[in-house]
UniProtKB/Swiss-Prot annotation:
Signal peptide annotation: none
Name by which UniProt lists this protein: 33 kDa chaperonin
GO molecular function, one term: protein folding chaperone
UniProt entry keywords in alphabetical sequence: Chaperone, Cytoplasm, Disulfide bond, Redox-active center, Zinc
Species of provenance: Pectobacterium carotovorum subsp. carotovorum (strain PC1)
Family, similarity comment: Belongs to the HSP33 family.
SUPFAM superfamilies named in the record: Hsp33 domain, HSP33 redox switch-like
Keyword Chaperone: yes
Pfam families recorded: HSP33
Modifications made to the protein after synthesis: Under oxidizing conditions two disulfide bonds are formed involving the reactive cysteines. Under reducing conditions zinc is bound to the reactive cysteines and the protein is inactive.
Annotated function: Redox regulated molecular chaperone. Protects both thermally unfolding and oxidatively damaged proteins from irreversible aggregation. Plays an important role in the bacterial defense system toward oxidative stress.
Disulfide bond residue pairs: C229-C231, C262-C265
Amino acid sequence: MAHDQLYRYLFENYAVRGELVTVNETYQRILTNHDYPSAVQTLLGEMLVATSLLTATLKFSGDITVQLQGDGPLKLAVINGNHQQQMRGVARLQGDIAPGSSLKEMVGNGYLVITITPTEGERYQGVVGLEGETVAECLESYFQQSEQLPTRLFIRTGQHEGKQAAAGMLLQVLPAQDADRDDFDHLAQLTTTVKGEELFSLPATEVLYRLYHQEEVTVYEPQDVEFRCHCSRDRCADALMTLSDQEVNEMIEQDGEIDMHCDYCGTHYLFNSLDIRAIRHDSSGNLLH
């Protein structure tokens, strides 16, 4: 794939659907401006792939946030994606994390939170204990508990052409369909054989042919995946206006300006005393652009 894309596909003879995604560029963008330990980089790649695959299961406009938190040296890791496959993510650390650290070693006593937020309607949140060895295993447990749909995730991270790479696949029994468990296990066994380098470098149709050449598979038009941060100067201004005038003035007096930094994309938004005065006198925010 020339750039990050997600493919949906359907097995003609089984009540099972699949997804295949490559997120190399998006993954590299999330890691830019962050000096994460290698184990955290790998974990964020796994979470990014998983979030993209989960977001593609949405039947409505909205977004999904996959978040890990606990009492270990990795305090927080979060990936957010929407139905347009616009992704962003960040991690927060407190302590050293050795190369090759396991999920449990990084997060400690913690949990995985999946938050689904429709554009219209009520937000849903599911919490899963870190029973599995990997993010994929934890999410498979989530699907089993909440959706009762047999689901498998196959996530690969590594390097391709000297850069970080991440990709993966999802298999899921179709809702309201009576899929034979043996059929699902058969397809899962085939999918398990996929190699990271195949996903990182080969066209999706070739990967699917290699895996399922004896099956009838319908592949749908791909959807682009990209890094997209939703921060803006206006949002930062709104946040500043939640503070008291005294707090804002003290920050200006101390440093001469207020520097608001976005953890997701690394953008800095600077506000001086003139900016603050303009914000206070223009509730519409027109002077901020």
